[in-house]
């Protein structure tokens, strides 16, 4: 029963931190350490992220199906650029063993680095603009690859 309560707490942490420019994975790692949850690898994080994905799909299902032209998304460059931006993260995920970074010591430093990145990006936000093209989609994908690390925020990137 205690384990169930711990995982409910982790689910709440995931839900509260996913849509802010903080690392939900990093916070999950920290709270697993605080709650003394023995989790080998990233299984709890993966399950929590699938829960987030499921809730997002449910949330946006209504707006997608109420769209006047459902084919717009699939006939625009959006799907193409979304695929391009995913490629670097997939390659990094296949090449590197990220599970070694799911520990309290690494996360504390990556959360600190993430905070500095967010401050720097907020200062630079008006100095450049990206147009959606192959190069910018690939660049976005490279930054998202860095965000695979726990403690680095995907939305902060």
Regions found by a protein language model. Name each.
Residues 1-157:
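Multi-pass membrane proteins that catalyze or facilitate reactions on polyprenyl-/lipid-phosphate substrates
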């Amino acid at each position: 029963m205690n384990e169930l309560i711990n995982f409910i707490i982790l689910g709440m942490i995931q839900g509260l931190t996913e849509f802010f420019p903080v690392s939900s994975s990093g916070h999950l790692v920290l709270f697993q350490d605080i709650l003394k949850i023995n989790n080998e690898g990233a299984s709890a994080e993966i399950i929590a992220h699938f829960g987030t994905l499921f809730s997002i799909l449910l949330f946006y299902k209504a707006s997608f199906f109420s769209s006047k032209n459902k084919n717009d998304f699939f006939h625009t460059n959006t799907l193409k650029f979304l695929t391009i931006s995913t490629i670097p993260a997939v390659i990094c995920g296949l090449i590197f063993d990220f599970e070694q970074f799911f520990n309290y010591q690494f996360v504390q430093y990556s959360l600190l680095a993430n905070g500095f990145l967010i401050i720097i990006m907020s200062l630079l936000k008006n100095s450049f603009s990206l147009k959606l093209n192959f190069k910018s989609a690939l660049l976005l994908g490279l930054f998202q690859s860095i965000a695979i690390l726990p403690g680095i925020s995907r939305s902060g990137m």
